[in-house]
Amino acid sequence: MKKTLYILIFLSCSVMANNLPELGDYSSSKISENEEIFIGRQILFQVNQSDSIIRDIEVSGYLDLLGKKLIKASTDPAKKIEFFIVNDSSINAFAMLGGVIGVHSGLFLASNTESELASVISHEIAHINQKHISRFLAQQERASYQSTFLMAVALLLARSNPQLASTTMAGASAGSVQGALDFTRENEKEADRVGIQTLNNAGFDVRGARDFFTTLKKDNQFSGGAAPAFLQTHPITSNRISDI
């Protein structure tokens, strides 16, 4: 079942690639708002075909309400963002191009308070509002189309399945990989900062972010499925805790 969703994520990237402008010059590498909306619709269509999605009305409704509350308190209160829940026990959530956020069921179980859960959702909302994925694609303008596409796929997959990301990254050059990871680490720091502002604006306890990072650090220490340090698209968790 999980494999089905990973394939859908890859197909979502394929949709993205088919609608990307040429990456030859910087100005044409930026994705327009209309293109993002189109991509988001395609992603949701494919997600809705998956049997890995939890469709419980109460849980999904709760996530939607929480998400809307955080969006209203974010840097772009009018932004339309769609949420879905992945039937996966690992602690994770990920933002995708087109205003789509996936949340693993394991995140709900690992969150001790609503503020902890909200801190993760606000972080992903920040990724979307700060246009981190489209900015990444623009930053890769000098890379070959194939390398850029593979990195885009890998970075999305890394948020849901590190092992799959490792395989995909093998198809991209080492230089492009390192440059992209440096870029995404900066994105993570920015998403932390903006996300905490959103959390505070929405009336949640910002200490929830610190508490969740502590939980995440413990999970990484004892989880055999954690990605190697050089493939992590997030800053070292201890550094993120100290930054809060």
Residue ranges of each PLM-predicted region?
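Sec-dependent N-terminal signal peptides
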Residues: T4-C13
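Active-site-adjacent, His/Asp/Glu-enriched structural segments that form or flank metal-binding
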Residues: A170-A172, E186-E190
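Aromatic-capped interface at the extracytoplasmic side
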Residues: S166, G179-T184
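Peri-catalytic and regulatory segments of divalent metal-dependent proteins
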Residues: N18-S160, V177-L181, E190-H234, S238, ...
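Phosphoinositide system proteins, centered on phosphoinositide phosphatases
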Residues: Q163-M169
